[in-house]
């Protein structure tokens, strides 16, 4: 996908309007505990450029405040097909508020640990993990065996 200068500007502007919320009340130690280092616009744009289109379901399993999902929507993704999982309840609330302005239903954004398979129970039955047919957008540190969703039970 080619990301136009106009879209780059929109992504940067949208990011900057929420940046003050991202670290609100969180010390560096707390952010390190949850792995909270949010994706800057430059990296988000590079990730968008890797996609041919954004017509499918998009899951960000470490969505934070929703910056990557917001950028996908600004680039044309269907907000109702955008999903996120976040470990920190405070950050998840910021994400829900941020993405509701872009049309993402709050029930598409879930509290949970993406490394455990139990957090995926919230998603509609039509949601697929078929990596041959769906593009899976992973933002953050992925488990060693990315598609073994129950791997953490056997550590």
Where would I find each of the regions flagged by the language model?
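SAM-dependent methyltransferase catalytic region
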Residues: 1-155
């Amino acid at each position: 996908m080619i990301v136009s200068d106009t879209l780059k500007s929109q992504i940067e502007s949208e990011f900057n309007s929420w940046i003050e919320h991202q670290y609100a009340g969180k010390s560096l130690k707390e952010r390190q505990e949850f792995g909270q280092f949010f994706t800057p616009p430059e990296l988000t744009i590079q990730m968008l450029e890797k996609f041919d289109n954004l017509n499918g379901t998009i899951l960000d399993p470490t969505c934070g405040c929703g910056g990557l999902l917001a950028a996908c929507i600004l680039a044309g993704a269907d907000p109702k097909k955008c999903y996120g999982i976040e470990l920190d309840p405070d950050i998840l609330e910021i994400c829900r508020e941020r993405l509701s302005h872009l049309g993402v239903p709050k029930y598409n954004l879930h509290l949970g640990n993406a490394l455990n398979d139990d957090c995926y129970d919230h998603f509609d039955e039509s949601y697929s993990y078929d990596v041959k047919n769906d593009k899976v957008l992973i933002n953050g540190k992925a488990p060693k065996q990315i598609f073994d969703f129950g791997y953490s039970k056997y550590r």
